[in-house]
Amino acid sequence: TTEIEPLTQKSLFNARKQVNKIHMSEAVEEYLVQLILATRNSRAYSGELGQWLDYGASPRATIALDKCSRALAWMEGRDFVTPDDIRAVAHDVLRHRLILSFEAEAGGINANQVIDKLLETVPSA
């Protein structure tokens, strides 16, 4: 059997430094920002999104989406973020940060479905 060694504080801090160095191109960064903006001004992007969202994601969601997509790229051995990285973490990052409308909830629409529509609506880099 393989012995698992505990994670040290030093190795955790080193990993954090490496993740922060992961490159995100301007085009990919713009895609990330547009996803967040689409939650705040949803009617401009899609009538359905406009009906489903009362409140969109906060500035902290932008930061979390950025950090999580960089971390995923790092864990996959890349030194750059792709739109696929952003899409891969979007549900986990945004699910609890969106306030759905009464219409959405009454219609059986959940946050995952709203995020699916968001990813389908906002063009990627």
List where the protein language model places each region.
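Phosphate-sensing "switch" segment of ASCE/P-loop ATPases
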Residues: T1-A44
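C-terminal engagement/docking regions of AAA+ P-loop ATPases
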Residues: K17, N41-A125
